[in-house]
From Swiss-Prot:
Stretch list, region Phosphoribosyl-ATP pyrophosphohydrolase: 124-209
Subcellular location: Cytoplasm
CC annotations in GO: cytoplasm
Annotated protein name in UniProt: Histidine biosynthesis bifunctional protein HisIE
Organism of provenance: Pyrococcus furiosus (strain ATCC 43587 / DSM 3638 / JCM 8422 / Vc1)
Taxon lineage: Archaea, Methanobacteriati, Methanobacteriota, Thermococci, Thermococcales
Ligase keyword on record: no
Gene3D superfamilies with a match to the protein in the record: MazG-like, Phosphoribosyl-AMP cyclohydrolase
Length: 209
């Protein structure tokens, strides 16, 4: 069936153009609860990779765009009221930002599992490599590739917007979340200018002397 006809089956009007999406792996384990607007579902259908709509950021992102933990979509189901979706996916890596396989990894009332802090900063190097690949070999539906396509003005604007998000964040968890976004957009800005993270590290070492 044509993509546009599939999109028409969803009741977008009920929740202001956004529908909840339950995500399961092929064994039936629930991985996360996400959201889609029409464009996110379109990108998912076109690419076969899960794209979700961030209500807090007001934008679409491919799952795993930054982490590499993409979700290949095997099947999409719709509920009886046509206002919720179920994605059956093959995940590459954990679904949760905490590093857990599923976002539903604890019972109600259980304390949060705190992951050990990694001070190696190796994740920044890994992220830099992913961003470089998106620049050199654009991927359809990739947020990073889209930034490079739109060019300098868009990249610098997004970096500025993310810096403001850090400044206005009040809660500890929100500050961590926004700083992570800021670091990602900083790496995009550096990569756009063909500046490596290593060069910045060398400058910091020089200043320490």
């Amino acid at each position: 069936m044509e993509i546009e006809k599939l999109l028409e089956q969803v009741n977008w009007e009920k929740n202001n153009g956004i529908v909840p999406v339950i995500v399961q792996d092929e064994k039936g384990e629930v991985l996360t609860l996400a959201y889609m607007n029409k464009e996110a579902l379109r990108k998912t259908l076109e690419t076969g990779i899960a794209h979700y709509y961030s209500r807090s950021k007001g934008r679409i992102r491919m799952k795993g765009e930054v982490s590499g933990n993409i979700q290949t979509v095997k099947e999409i189901k719709i509920d009886c009221d046509n206002d919720a979706l179920l994605l059956i996916v093959s995940p590459k890596g954990p679904a949760c930002h905490t590093g857990n396989y599923s976002c539903f990894y604890r019972k109600l009332g259980e304390p949060e599992r705190v992951l050990p802090i990694d001070y190696s900063l190796s994740i920044l190097k890994e992220l830099e490599e992913i961003i470089k690949r998106r620049k050199e070999t654009p991927v359809e539906g990739s947020y990073t590739s889209k930034l490079f396509k739109e060019g300098r003005e868009k990249i610098y604007k997004k970096f500025g917007e993310e810096a403001i998000e850090v400044l206005v964040a009040e809660k500890r968890e929100r500050i961590i979340y926004e700083v992570a976004d800021l670091l990602y957009h900083l790496l995009v800005l550096l990569t756009y200018n063909d500046i490596s993270l290593g060069e910045v590290m060398n400058e910091l070492r020089r200043r320490r002397k």
